[in-house]
Amino acid sequence: MSVASEMREMSVEALDDKMKALYQEAFNLRFQHATAQLENTSRIRQVRREIALIKTVIGERKAKEEV
């Protein structure tokens, strides 16, 4: 199952919780990157994309409810 389909099955509350956790992780990754302690720099991109995916799924649900 793809990440997008897994996210689409989650509730809005679960998506919000996951997004908050990802924002915290992104903050920590940026801090580690700035202090040259980050080994896996590709994780920054992965986290950014997961946040974008969650925002997209939430937006799709809001648009669907308005119709």
From Swiss-Prot:
Alphabetic keyword roster: Ribonucleoprotein, Ribosomal protein
Record-level GO cellular component terms: cytosolic large ribosomal subunit
GO molecular function: structural constituent of ribosome
Gene3D superfamilies attached to this UniProt entry: 1.10.287.310
Taxonomic superkingdom: Bacteria
Keyword Ribonucleoprotein found: yes
Biological process per Gene Ontology, one example term: translation
Pfam families, sorted: Ribosomal_L29 (PF00831)
SUPFAM superfamilies, per database record: Ribosomal protein L29 (L29p) (SSF46561)
Protein name: Large ribosomal subunit protein uL29
Organism of origin: Magnetococcus marinus (strain ATCC BAA-1437 / JCM 17883 / MC-1)
Gene that encodes the chain: rpmC
